[in-house]
Regions:
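A cross-family phosphate/adenosyl-ligand binding-site feature
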Residues: 1-120, 124-145
């Protein structure tokens, strides 16, 4: 059953950011989420994403920012506090690790901890996207939910 069918409104989203170039546009993604009624937004940065942005600048537009493992809040508590995880941008490296259940950083850990299906927004060029390994990883993640 979908959220539309149950009438569930998602108001609390945890955004997982990896180190793709599209990380530089994360403010646009956050603004789009706010425009559709997402009221509480937290961000978990992978180490490479944290190197690409100022966590202080993110704190100005979201409710919480998490960088290090162990994070300042327990991953299980976060999985209860937020209704959905949206990984944007998701690198090919993230997809490969996530497809095998990796938990090397906060973003991967949250993907495993969330009790609800997650949304993953891949970010790579067309040649990388077309690789059979990337497509296998996507298929695994879709199957896993």
């Amino acid at each position: 059953m979908t959220e539309a069918e149950t009438g569930t409104v998602v108001e609390r989203v945890l955004v997982g950011c990896t180190g793709a170039l599209q990380m530089l546009s994360i403010g646009d993604y956050i603004a789009a989420m706010r425009s559709v009624g997402i009221r509480r937004i937290g961000v978990v940065l992978s180490p490479s994403a944290a190197a690409m942005t100022s966590p202080a600048s993110l704190e100005a537009i979201v409710n919480e920012v998490f960088i290090e493992l162990p994070m300042t809040r327990n991953h299980i508590a976060l999985s209860r506090d937020y209704q959905r995880l949206v990984v944007v941008p998701a690198t090919a490296n993230f997809l490969a690790s996530a497809a095998t259940g990796g938990a090397r950083n906060g973003v991967e850990l949250m993907l495993i901890a969330m009790p609800t299906p997650s949304v993953i927004v891949p970010a790579m060029n067309g040649a990388m996207w077309a690789k059979p390994a990337v497509q296998r990883n996507i298929a695994t993640l879709v199957e896993d939910g």
